[in-house]
């Protein structure tokens, strides 16, 4: 019981950190949604749906809306913009893409850690005391089957072209 409580604290703290830092980065660096459209290359028109419209982001990246990450595009798009602009970058945001990319990975690892701890404690209590912890269903969405696709979508490293 105590372990599950600790896991839920880690889980909600990581979500809080994601919300605070993402809002801070958004207002500090990218004051307008138009910035994303201008920074990303025009020859990837499909990306603008995800970048510029919240509905598109939530449709393709439901994980983002889950953690209130709606003001930042996915890491893959940021890295794509970084790859495109590393030689000529009129906006001066070259290195920030790498920082946000690392930040996205850190958030995923935090959430995965919380999920693994929560699921492990719930399973342990179920095996030892035959208690089914239905109230800890908050951890169900982040079983490996669901976390890994989310991580793949968020932190895809583009080689040729760009996109999830």
Swiss-Prot record:
Partially overlaps PDI1. This is Putative uncharacterized protein YCL041C. It comes from Saccharomyces cerevisiae (strain ATCC 204508 / S288c) (Baker's yeast).
């Amino acid at each position: 019981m105590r372990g599950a409580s600790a896991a839920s604290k880690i889980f909600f703290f990581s979500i809080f950190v994601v919300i605070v830092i993402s809002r801070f980065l958004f207002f500090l660096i990218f004051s307008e949604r138009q910035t994303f459209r201008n920074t990303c290359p025009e020859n990837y028109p499909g990306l603008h749906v995800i970048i510029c419209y919240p509905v598109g982001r939530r449709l393709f990246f439901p994980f983002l809306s889950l953690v209130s990450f709606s003001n930042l595009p996915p890491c893959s798009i940021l890295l794509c913009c970084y790859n495109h602009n590393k030689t000529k970058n009129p906006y001066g945001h070259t290195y920030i893409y790498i920082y946000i990319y690392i930040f996205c990975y850190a958030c995923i690892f935090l959430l995965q850690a919380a999920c693994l701890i929560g699921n492990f404690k719930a399973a342990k209590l179920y095996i030892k005391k035959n208690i089914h912890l239905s109230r800890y269903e908050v951890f169900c969405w982040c079983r490996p089957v669901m976390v890994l696709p989310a991580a793949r979508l968020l932190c895809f490293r583009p080689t040729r072209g760009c996109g999830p």
